[in-house]
Amino acid sequence: MAKKISALQLMAGIAALSFGFVSCSTEEPSPEPEPEPEGPSPYVAKVFDYRPAAGQYVNVIPEYEEGDTQEDMNRKALEAICGDADGMISLGGFGGYVVVGFDHTVENKAGLCDFRVLGNAFYATGQSEYGNSEPGVIQVSCDANRNGQPDDAWYEIAGSSHNGTESWIQKAADAGNDTQTVRDYEITYYRPASTPTKPTKEYIRWEDNQGNSGYRAKNDTHKQPYYPQWIDEEKLTFKGTRLPQNAIDLSGQGNNFGLFRFAYGYADNVQSTLDPSAIDIDWAVDADGNPANLKGIDFIRIYTGINQENGWLGECSTEIAGIVDLHMCNIVIESAGIKK
């Protein structure tokens, strides 16, 4: 704030200039104080790659504008999920992902959860088993070569369906869902020739490496293209661990879908304020399922873990609203209480 100058001071200054007064003081002007350096942030500091699969919220959160490049969309994704921005990004259908980094190493503290991925999952009224769970698989990496880039080995957070099962699996199987966890799953989406003006169940074609094929449906609510418009490729291929299909039509009429929560270890799976949304770095495993034994992490990659259409709700698509270093926020959550 500028210092207020009195009329008397102003007049004295004018007089000094008029009569050529020269100060006899030998004192140097006081230097401006250096700004205090900002400390590390508990939130995401950079988005390295935002690459969603086809989905009803793609090109909307964040918004694609004509001419946007990959760099533009990375920037928009960061603006949506950094700090307390209160925004959100959609990863689209299975495989769509975002790669983020911190301005510090997130420490792995023994027996404690280390970070939390924020999403928009919630429970249905009066429920603690299902609601709007759209789980994303989480991978972590440390900057082993110290070049500031996410180009070192990735390790998967072994959530509850990695080697185990969920309490609702039989119910999902009875409903006709594919309840297998598939490692090395691969899916390819094909750019549609045009965007239909009316709802259709056959909008964006996909094929996977399990011999299955189908379409991403187009609904009446979201009228924009569902294929990411800044990507030039005519097809998009994603790989990863595919989780069991968790959406069940509870009504039998196609108008009341319950998306059942997984026990632990995934993004956008339970409400972000609840302990099971927290992640312990000790859950990270290598490609052979062996503990990664990481002292800390610098990068996180999250991708949508389910390939499923849920009637009028649309596809299962992981949404991300941010990531928080729990230790920097003095939030203590014991991982043993979650993984049980």
Name each model feature, range by range:
Residues S141-N147:
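Short loop/turn segments immediately following beta-strands, especially the blade-tip
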Residues G148-I157:
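Tryptophan-centered short beta-strand motifs
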Residues L10-I14, P150:
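A generic structural signal for short, non-catalytic loop/turn and secondary-structure boundary residues
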Residues P31-E134, G159-K340:
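A domain-level signal for the mature, folded cores of soluble proteins
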Residues V137-Q139:
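Beta-strand signatures of extracellular beta-sandwich domains
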Residues A2, A16-A45:
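Bacterial Sec-dependent N-terminal signal peptides
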Residues M1-M11:
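Bacterial N-terminal signal peptides that target proteins for export
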